[in-house]
Amino acid sequence: MSMFLDTAKISVQAGRGGDGMVAFRREKYVPNGGPWGGDGGKGGSVIFKVDEGLRTLMDFRYNRKFKAKNGEKGMTKGMHGRGAEDLIVSIPPGTTVRDAETGKVITDMVEDGQEFVVAHGGRGGRGNIRFATPRNPAPEIAENGEPGEERELQLELKILADVGLVGFPSVGKSTILSVVTAAKPKIGAYHFTTIVPNLGMVRTKSGESFAMADLPGLIEGASQGVGLGTQFLRHIERTRVILHVIDMSASEGRDPYEDYLQINKELETYNLRLMERPQIIVANKMDMPEAEENLKEFKEKLAANYDEFDELPQIFPISSLAHQGLENLLEATAELLDQTDEFLLYNEDDMEQEEVYYGFNEEERPFEISRDDDASWVLSGEKLEKLFVMTNMERDESIMKFARQLRGMGVDEALRERGAKDGDIVRIGNFEFEFVD
């Protein structure tokens, strides 16, 4: 049996765009050939793709870094560099992708074949053929390729099941799953026999089918991490109907009704929205002594805690071991599923706001100025830093162009306002230059 892994932290890095080329056309009979340097190719993106054949995040246990290839450099004769192929990373259905730094949900991937770009490849730098103007017909300017997007991601697998079996350990959840589906969960007469979720397909006599998950047993304090804690509570979130399994024989000395209240409390504490899901109470082990009396007492306590006009949850007495009462339970479950819509897993506050990768917010200041300990001025900011890394600092014309761009952004004026003097050191990353007033 393969090891079950339902969380992983990984890093992804898209490819850098290829550098543009500085070249000139030098051919016989072609005087003043002009610029001929082509653009660099686009860097490869990192794309997640859902593969329904995968069931866990085990592939990410040892392989935690994913890096796409860089685009090729531009070439002479105005030829563009080849764009790099995208890196396709397969993930199981039901995977939620979060930004590890902010915790925001980037995407929730559930459909087979669904794709999502988690890191965009950098744009290729422009060659000098792009910078020719009537005033400068032979520019020695070309851009470096844009760096690819890089980010840390948190992956969470929440299995795709229509129905979830919940309850205390050893109440018979795994036995129910093994009887009504072809799944073969581990079954034993001790607590926490089930330590990973098990999934099976149910088919009723009337022809209805649905996916059922047996989740590891919950105990008091599970929502705070006691026992197996929240490690597997996340798998209940995608279910539409909850089958609340209770040991009606009270074989371990617990009160069945107190068990019922305690499990609901844990579900509510973990995620209030779990209590929106309809529940069917499964009174298991009805073939045991005192089960009938306990069920009668359970119903009385349940009714006493509901208002007169509230609808009581359905209760189905069964014996999974003796295969009694299961058909009625499954038919009722299928009927309830038909009446229940899917629940919204995340609201807008959970989701990361989608942004245009190459765009900039007009309202945001394109740069920031700070003072270092050595009295030098430090320039930072996404737009400014992107212009810097795409500037070829080995060519004078490119440096002059970058200086004009800084002036156009208002950097010179802002430095003067902050008190910068002629000859002061200004730093962008590891690059230093003198401020000229």
Swiss-Prot record:
One of its GO terms (molecular function) is GTPase activity. One of its GO terms (biological process) is ribosome biogenesis. Its EC number is 3.6.5.-. Residues 127-146 are annotated as: Disordered. The keyword GTP-binding applies. Its cofactor is Mg(2+). Keywords: Cytoplasm, GTP-binding, Hydrolase, Magnesium, Metal-binding, Nucleotide-binding. CDD domains: Obg. GO terms for cellular component: cytoplasm. Mg(2+) binds at S174, T194. Monomer. An essential GTPase which binds GTP, GDP and possibly (p)ppGpp with moderate affinity, with high nucleotide exchange rates and a fairly low GTP hydrolysis rate. Plays a role in control of the cell cycle, stress response, ribosome biogenesis and in those bacteria that undergo differentiation, in morphogenesis control. NCBIfam families: Obg_CgtA (TIGR02729), Obg_CgtA_exten (TIGR03595), PRK12296.1 (NF008954), PRK12297.1 (NF008955), PRK12299.1 (NF008956), small_GTP (TIGR00231). This is GTPase Obg. The gene is obg.
